[in-house]
UniProtKB/Swiss-Prot annotation:
Pfam families: LAP2alpha, LEM, Thymopoietin. Residues 107-117 have a biased composition (Acidic residues). The modification N6-acetyllysine is found at residue 656. Expressed in many tissues. Most abundant in adult thymus and fetal liver. Residues 155-178 have a biased composition (Polar residues). GO terms for molecular function: cadherin binding; DNA binding; lamin binding. The modification Phosphoserine is found at residues 59, 66-67, 79, 156, 159, 166, 168, 272, 312, 351, 354, 370, 424. It comes from Homo sapiens. Keywords: Acetylation, Cardiomyopathy, Chromosome, Coiled coil, DNA-binding, Methylation, Nucleus, Pharmaceutical, Phosphoprotein. This is Lamina-associated polypeptide 2, isoform alpha. The modification Phosphothreonine is found at residues 57, 74, 154, 160, 164. The lineage of its organism: Eukaryota, Metazoa, Chordata, Craniata, Vertebrata. SUPFAM superfamilies: LEM domain (SSF63451).
Length: 694
């Protein structure tokens, strides 16, 4: 029995026609494209290589091979959309009637090799897979994928599309090869693609999204030492310690306990015995600069109203937990920044709350907050009062030095507070000077000289970082002269939880990007224009299709490396786009927090009897700070994902001209990244194996 090629695309068009005629295969009328003859070859000749499977064994997938010498199919350029692939697969093929499809009860007994391309695509979609185009060079890969899914029995009946910003490659890699053609484009099916494909980047109605809060799911298994979760407003640290992390998710914060509101004379005692203000005091300098004069507050409020997102859009695109946070912020801006929360600021004296208040009052004498935290709260209150025009907290005039408002105002560019401030790009940071070529160690490693004086950390940034480190209890090395903090040591450390996130992303550098559309939604227009991976122009694809392909194994290996390089760059673009989503949402929330803290300071300084309003504002600011904290970890994850895919791209760039087989190249490219060197210790193993063969 003759052996037919598994990948007939390597044959010329005339050779394909002669092989089909020699084996009694009827050719279609007229001159057809090469893909049509490749498809006929696969259906009628390649299928003869495999003996028919006995009944009852269709659900078992083929054995997985891990040999380095196994020749892998070379992906071809194709459209990244599933519908475009569906239209191409139908070219030159007899249309399949609906009545020809197998019955529901017979689908489990079908041989995947007998399915048409369209039926195979439908089966993969039913199992929750979003495949690329199915052509001759990719069909075998998808057949194996379908067999594995049927064996696992994980068919997904869901018809709701995932709200992803762009397509990500499926984890169908074998010996390092995957469906890289999802990011490629072809000249076929361009006109039909937009009609057939329903964009997965459209805004998903809020009713179709889950309303269960995330509960800080990203923080499961991640904890900061010596930095405990701040308690709800009006509670002590010991009481809050009993409530944190008693389940997998974070418990919802309780409303404020009804108490007699203190006057100005009682404010010191209130600040020293209860944790009224949860936010770290690292933001008070920025808040002071934002509100250098109380008369400018209405202008800032109006600017914030004009730039904040509309709550109606957020209602349709955000899950319950994040919708509440962002809606509360936007609601305060729409009402002229009067952030009163009925369930928190207007407190009822119900029996459960009364019992908690009684327990709180009984424990005040023995469960006082620690002196460092009390001092931090006191300093923070002082900063708010100074900002509002009051000298300091009564009885604590010496607790902190007076703030130099003039110097702060000199550092502020007044043009930054115009209506275009929030949407304007940030100032560019000067590039660090590079060492000379002689001082570089090896490769593309770049070392940096000491930062010149003009590029040192600004006094404003130095103040914020130093203040944050002090609040978090992190020590910083100091110079002996002038008692100033050394700029080279003034930095935040890489905490073990952040390093853990980076390590997880680098362990599998080609993993699929998680969807962030529910937590950080954007409109479909912005997602298509900014966040989607750019498609290759049709003119460029036309030039590529006209080029004569070079023969030989080395040429095929180089072409595969080029496609994998393009795939890695597309993934890096997706990760960077996701980080952009997160940064955009974080900027809006942080801007609203500035206005909230500024208004709370004005309330405390002008009318202490309205302290409950300030507490309501700070309570919502706490929620916004939690949102920003979790968003920061998501942004770390996206940054690590971008670094991993950039590393994969560089690996294929260096490997494409190496004289090793394609399987070894793919294995080296997918090796877990550890930093330092591009490939790590895996290179020695491959070189030894290759040396033994020779």
């Amino acid at each position: 029995m003759p052996e037919f090629l598994e990948d007939p695309s390597v044959l010329t068009k005339d050779k394909l026609k002669s092989e089909l005629v020699a084996n009694n295969v009827t050719l279609p009328a007229g001159e057809q494209r090469k893909d049509v003859y490749v498809q006929l070859y696969l259906q009628h000749l390649t299928a003869r290589n495999r003996p028919p499977l006995p009944a009852g064994t269709n659900s078992k997938g083929p054995p997985d091979f891990s040999s380095d010498e196994e020749r892998e199919p070379t992906p071809v350029l194709g459209s990244g959309a599933a519908a475009a692939g569906r239209s191409r697969a139908a070219v030159g093929r007899k249309a399949t009637k609906k009545t020809d499809k197998p019955r529901q009860e017979d689908k489990d007994d079908l041989d995947v090799t007998e399915l048409t391309n369209e039926d195979l695509l439908d089966q993969l979609v039913k199992y929750g897979v979003n495949p690329g185009p199915i052509v001759g060079t990719t069909r075998k890969l998808y057949e194996k994928k379908l067999l594995k899914l049927r064996e696992q029995g994980t068919e997904s009946r869901s018809s709701t599309p995932l709200p992803t910003i762009s397509s990500s490659a499926e984890n169908t890699r074998q010996n390092g090869s995957n469906d890289s053609d999802r990011y490629s484009d072809n000249e076929e099916g361009k006109k039909k693609e937009h009609k057939k494909v329903k964009s997965t980047r459209d805004i998903v109605p809020f009713s179709e999204l889950g309303t269960t809060p995330s509960g800080g799911g990203f923080f499961q298994g991640i904890s900061f030492p010596e930095i405990s979760t701040r308690p709800p407003l009006g509670s002590t640290e010991l009481q809050a310690a009993k409530k944190v992390h008693t389940s997998k998710g974070d418990l919802p914060r309780e409303p404020l306990v009804a108490t007699n509101l203190p006057g100005r004379g009682q404010l010191q005692k209130l600040a020293s015995e209860r944790n009224l203000f949860i936010s770290c005091k690292s933001s008070h300098d920025r808040c002071l600069e934002k509100s250098s004069s109380s008369s400018s507050q209405p202008e800032h409020s109006a600017m914030l109203v004009s730039t904040a997102a509309s709550p109606s859009l957020i209602k349709e695109t955000t899950t319950g937990y994040y919708k509440d946070i962002v809606e509360n912020i936007c609601g305060r801006e729409k009402s002229g920044i009067q952030p009163l929360c009925p369930e928190r600021s207007h407190i009822s004296d119900q029996s459960p709350l009364s019992s908690k208040r009684k327990a709180l009052e009984e424990s005040e004498s023995s469960q006082l907050i620690s002196p460092p935290l009390a001092q931090a709260i006191r300093d923070y209150v002082n900063s708010l009062l100074v900002q509002g025009g009051v000298g300091s907290l009564p009885g604590t005039s010496n607790s902190m030095p007076p703030l130099d408002v003039e110097n702060i105002q000199k550092r502020i560019d007044q043009s930054k507070f115009q209506e275009t401030e929030f949407l304007s790009p940030p100032r560019k940071v000067p590039r660090l000077s590079e060492k000379s070529v002689e001082e570089r160690d090896s490769g593309s490693f770049v070392a940096f000289q000491n930062i010149p004086g003009s590029e040192l950390m600004s006094s404003f940034a130095k103040t914020v970082v130093s203040h944050s480190l002090t609040t978090l209890g992190l020590e910083v090395a100091k110079q002996s002269q002038h008692d100033k903090i050394d700029a080279s040591e003034l930095s935040f450390p890489f905490h073990e939880s952040i390093l853990k996130v980076i390590e997880e992303e680098w362990q599998q550098v080609d993993r699929q990007l998680p969807s962030l559309a529910c937590k950080y939604p954007v409109s479909s227009r912005e997602a298509t224009q900014i966040l989607s991976v750019p498609k290759v122009d049709d003119e460029i694809l036309g030039f590529i299709s006209e080029a004569t392909p070079l023969g030989g194994i080395q040429a095929a290996s180089t072409e595969s490396c080029n496609q994998q390089l393009d795939l890695a760059l597309c993934r890096a673009y997706e990760a960077a786009a996701s980080a952009l989503q997160i940064a955009t949402h974080t900027a809006f929330v942080a801007k609203a927090m500035q206005a909230d803290i500024s208004q709370a300071a004005q309330i405390l300084s002008s009318d202490p009897s309205r302290t409950h309003q300030a507490l309501g504002i700070l309570s919502k600011t706490y929620d916004a700070a939690s949102y920003i904290c979790e968003a920061a970890f998501d942004e770390v994850k996206m940054a690590a994902h971008t670094m991993g895919n950039a590393t994969v791209g560089r690996r294929y760039l260096w490997l494409k001209d190496c004289k090793i087989n394609l399987a070894s190249k793919n294995k080296l490219a997918s090796t877990p990244f550890k930093g330092g060197t591009l490939f790590g210790g895996e290179v020695c193993k491959v070189i030894k194996k290759r040396g033994n063969k020779h």
